C-alpha cells in the first residue's frame, strides 16, 4: 500500500513537471495541493457531456485554490500565464496572534539571516493599496485602539512628527504558502503576502494594508 502511494506521488509530480510552459498551471501555487488530490485519486476523471463523477470531490479537495488550479488537473481550460506573470499576483492573510515586540526586535539593525528587511513610508503603502474595504476595516480597528489615522484621505500620511514606516521582511528563498504563513507567524508578523512565484513577505505591525506588492526575495524573483 505504501509503495502504491509513492508511485502515485511520483506520477503526479511528473505530470506537473511535464506540462508545457505555455499552457502549464501555476506550479508554485498549485503543486502541493494538486499532488495531494491526485494521490487521493479525487481528480482522476475528466468532465464529459453531463457526466463528471469526481468533479465535486476534486473541487472540495482543492478548496480555495480551485479557480487557480483546476487547469492543473484537466478540469477547466488551460490558461496562458505569459500575460500575467506569477510575480504580479499574490495571496494575503491577516495573522490572528501577532507579536509586535518580537517582530520589531527581529527586524532592528543588520541581520545575517536569510531574509531581506525593507522599510518604507506608510503613505507609500497606501498609495497602491488594493482593497479599500480591507483598508477601512483596518482603520475601524485602529480607531478602537485609539490610534490616530487620517479620516478624509486614505493616501494621506499619518499626522506625526516622524512619518510612520511600514517594515516588511522578504525571505531569500522560495517557499510554499503554508511555510510562508508559519514563518511569518514565528517572527510575530501581523500579516503575510505570498506571491504566486513562491516569494514570501511578512508584514509588520506598523503597516496599514498588506505591505509592498513588489517581489524582493533574493533567490525567488521570477
UniProtKB/Swiss-Prot annotation:
Protein name (database record): Twisted gastrulation protein homolog 1
One Gene Ontology cellular component: extracellular space
InterPro entries in alphabetical order: Tsg (IPR006761)
Tissue-level expression: Expressed in lymph node, liver, kidney, and lung. Expression in the kidney was stronger in the medulla than in the cortex, particularly in the cells surrounding the medullary tubules. Expressed in growth plate cartilage of long bones, ribs, and digits and to a lesser extent also in the resting zone of the epiphysis, trabecular bone, and vertebral cartilage. Expression seems to be absent from other skeletal tissues including muscle, skin, and fibroblasts.
Compartments (UniProt record): Secreted
Domain notes: The N-terminal domain is sufficient to interact with BMP4.
Function comment: May be involved in dorsoventral axis formation. Seems to antagonize BMP signaling by forming ternary complexes with CHRD and BMPs, thereby preventing BMPs from binding to their receptors. In addition to the anti-BMP function, also has pro-BMP activity, partly mediated by cleavage and degradation of CHRD, which releases BMPs from ternary complexes. May be an important modulator of BMP-regulated cartilage development and chondrocyte differentiation. May play a role in thymocyte development.
Subunit structure as annotated in this protein's UniProt entry: Interacts with CHRD and/or BMP4. This interaction enhances CHRD/BMP4 complex formation. Interacts with BMP7.
GO MF annotation, one: heparin binding
Disruption phenotype: Embryonic lethality and sirenomelia were observed only in BMP null embryos in which one or two copies of TSG were also missing. When TSG and BMP7 are mutated, the siren phenotype results from the fusion of the limb buds in the ventroposterior midline owing to a paucity of posterior ventral mesoderm.
Broad class of where this protein is predominantly found: secreted
Organism annotation: Mus musculus (Mouse)
UniProt-annotated glycosylation sites, renumbered to this chain: 80, 146
Entry's family note: Belongs to the twisted gastrulation protein family.
Amino acid at each position: 500500500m505504501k509503495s502504491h502511494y509513492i508511485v502515485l506521488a511520483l506520477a503526479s509530480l511528473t505530470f506537473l513537471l511535464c506540462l508545457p510552459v505555455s499552457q502549464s498551471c501555476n506550479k508554485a501555487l498549485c503543486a502541493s495541493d494538486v499532488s495531494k488530490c491526485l494521490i487521493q485519486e479525487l481528480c482522476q476523471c475528466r468532465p464529459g457531456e453531463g457526466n463528471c463523477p469526481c468533479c465535486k470531490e476534486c473541487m472540495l479537495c482543492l478548496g480555495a485554490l480551485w479557480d487557480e488550479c483546476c487547469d492543473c488537473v484537466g478540469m477547466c481550460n488551460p490558461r496562458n500565464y505569459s500575460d500575467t506573470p506569477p510575480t504580479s499576483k499574490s495571496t494575503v492573510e491577516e495573522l490572528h496572534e501577532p507579536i509586535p515586540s518580537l517582530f520589531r526586535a527581529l527586524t532592528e539593525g543588520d541581520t545575517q539571516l536569510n531574509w531581506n528587511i525593507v522599510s518604507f513610508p506608510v503613505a507609500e503603502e497606501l498609495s497602491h493599496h488594493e482593497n479599500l474595504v480591507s483598508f477601512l476595516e483596518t482603520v475601524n480597528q485602529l480607531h478602537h485602539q485609539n490610534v490616530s489615522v487620517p479620516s478624509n484621505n486614505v493616501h494621506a500620511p499619518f499626522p506625526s512628527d516622524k512619518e510612520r514606516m511600514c517594515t516588511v521582511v522578504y525571505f531569500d528563498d522560495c517557499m510554499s504558502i503554508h511555510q510562508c504563513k508559519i514563518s511569518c507567524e514565528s517572527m510575530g508578523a501581523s500579516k503575510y503576502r505570498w506571491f504566486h512565484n513562491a516569494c514570501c513577505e511578512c508584514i509588520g505591525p506598523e503597516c496599514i494594508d498588506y505591505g509592498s506588492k513588489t517581489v524582493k526575495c533574493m533567490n525567488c524573483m521570477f
